[in-house]
Amino acid sequence: MRFNHFSIVDKNFDEQLAELDQLGFRWSVFWDEKKILKDFLIQSPSDMTDLQATAELDVIEFLKSSIELDWEIFWNIALQLLDFVPNFDFEIGKAFEYAKNSNLPQIEAEMTTENIISAFYYLLCTRRKNGMILVEHWVSEGLLPLDNHYHFFNDKSLATFDSSLLEREVLWVESPVDSEQRGENDLIKIQIIRPKSTEKLPVVMTASPYHLGINDKANDLALHDMNVELEEKASHEIHVEQKLPQKLSAKAKELPIVDKAPYRFTHGWTYSLNDYFLTRGFASIYVAGVGTRSSDGFQTSGDYQQIYSMTAVIDWLNGRARAYTSRKKTHEIKASWANGKVAMTGKSYLGTMAYGAATTGVEGLEVILAEAGISSWYNYYRENGLVRSPGGFPGEDLDVLAALTYSRNLDGADFLKGNAEYEKRLAEMTAALDRKSGDYNQFWHDRNYLINTDKVKADVLIVHGLQDWNVTPEQAYNFWKALPEGHAKHAFLHRGAHIYMNSWQSIDFSETINAYFVAKLLDRDLNLNLPPVILQENSKDQVWTMMNDFGANTQIKLPLGKTAVSFAQFDNHYDDETFKKYSKDFNVFKKDLFENKANEAVIDLELPSMLTINGPVELELRLKLNDTKGFLSAQILDFGQKKRLEDKARVKDFKVLDRGRNFMLDDLVELPLVESPYQLITKGFTNLQNQNLLTVSDLKADEWFTIKFELQPTIYHLEKADKLRVILYSTDFEHTVRDNRKVTYEIDLSQSKLIIPIESVKN
């Protein structure tokens, strides 16, 4: 078990004394160490009679004895306060060593009054076995009263807002878009959950098109057939223009202004990180945007009309937009309780909306926490001129997602009024996204947030799994690289798939975000010493490290051929039985592919030295095929039996994370380190007619040519003599169209290479 603390802010001794005093620990530097220990235990919500101090004495006996307090005894007691079990989790007499091996913060100095006070201060900042830092656990046990006012410790807000007194309101915000050209601004339903307090509250907002319901049946009916032949394309240049939808002005009309919303709600999905912030004095707002249940408009799916329907909420919080108590617009309501400062949170589509909102430069959005977000929708459903489904969802496309999230049709009355217009616009979207060619076009350009990163004002916090093949790592990497030089940004890169990380045991993620949001949303100093990149190591249990950047400038080139004359060949076509088997279950195909049982060329490379990949690996291939159209798929494995982190978190303890005071209890989880025969490092796909994004070229049969394309970016450490397995093939039954033509691909390995960005030891 190893803990990684990134949320702890260094404080001088006077600051420590002042903060401890506010918690009720009022100590003098003239007290001896044992008196301070005794008072610490008396003031705490723990029962000191349960604690063991030495191999022979419990704490009560120790305090009565003449034995002096030393660091070993301190850690015997401290570990128990952190929920470690003496004689089982750790050995009495070896507590200091156990704490050091667990990476717990320690004072490496002699035992003095000042040092023991500092030790208790940092102990309160330390993670318990259950994943909560000690001070937050004790506050949840009643260390401070629920007075609905802010209390801070180590630059973090504590859970002193009463979750039993939360206000829950439903409002309709007037957006600056008319997504169906009705001649009226679309109204957007929002749900607000906020503490009952006289304080002016900041907002943690989650923009989720899923929030008010999804239409699974419409989604399934809209799925595209993947068993189709690749289209041959005429050579041409692609032209796009940068444009944004014009914002509409609201129609001014004087209305009565009320203080309270008549509509309330009781149930609904909430993000547990937002719940955590609720009890710490941050309001939560959930907004689903245009084309969703009880709102107006069409589900425009990723364009700036959808984004503006989300940022309208931030405008309302800052007095620049209007909100109403009902869709009838008879009464207006102001955000008089809000301080106007907003953070956006959420994973996947939710993180995507955060990226998009940030690129509008909307005033009041101070920071985004974009988890597994999409920065360019083309790169989610396409790759290098090829239709490429996101991992786990073959046949999905943006029109399918629109059908899923157009939740207005879930209400019968709205279905009657709006379905005909919806069907017309959905058909237009299907045509515009152009599955036939797979090329970039104006439709996708309008859904590319990367071209507007120069407008970003908010601080950017990125969370992404390097084993996420749904929303692939390039989405985070590209946004990271596109931000202007010097922009405030940090990335948390974990080894999981498409998952949240705010309830993991090994890292104080929620507390780190707490310190960041407190500074940005409550006008306090940002003293958090956060590195640019916080990386979970790929072959160690519960180890996180710091890096300077995502993407290295140094490269090495590994030739794919072992001799001067070296060729590889694979066929595209499968017999009917195999084709049907793989089409039915792409996981069967993936297993066969990784074990060299599919139609593929496999090149195994033994590494001559240790290296860390940092960025997108590039393939440079010399090849030919016996057709005038074709596509290439590539995957690279870390091949060979060894321990690696799984990409799915496992529960370590149930319902032990208290988000407030017995509020929204959450499971403690972690990625396990397990034996495995291989692990996917990266993969990529390309249409051989698309050597760059905006050019389509002719492909000549039986003629050699060279192509270069990047695979997904990653950071991955490999040891000397580790084996890289490079897999080259055509049809991928999870991602690409299932083209079963009889095409043979031949690769000149002697003229082909792997170009790897590598991390310097210094970084």
Curated annotation (Swiss-Prot):
Protein name according to UniProt: Xaa-Pro dipeptidyl-peptidase
Protein localization: Cytoplasm
Keywords, comma-separated and alphabetical: Aminopeptidase, Cytoplasm, Hydrolase, Protease, Serine protease
Taxonomic source organism: Lactococcus lactis subsp. cremoris (strain SK11)
MF (Gene Ontology): aminopeptidase activity; dipeptidyl-peptidase activity; serine-type peptidase activity
Active site: 348, 468, 498
Function description: Removes N-terminal dipeptides sequentially from polypeptides having unsubstituted N-termini provided that the penultimate residue is proline.
Record InterPro entries: AB_hydrolase_fold (IPR029058), Galactose-bd-like_sf (IPR008979), Pept_S15_Xpro (IPR008252), PepX_N_dom (IPR015251), PepX_N_dom_sf (IPR036313), Xaa-Pro-like_dom (IPR000383), Xaa-Pro_dipept_C (IPR013736), Xaa-Pro_dipeptidyl-ppase/CocE (IPR050585)
Family: Belongs to the peptidase S15 family.
Pfam families on file: Peptidase_S15, PepX_C, PepX_N
BP-aspect Gene Ontology terms: proteolysis
SUPFAM superfamilies: alpha/beta-Hydrolases, Galactose-binding domain-like, X-Prolyl dipeptidyl aminopeptidase PepX, N-terminal domain
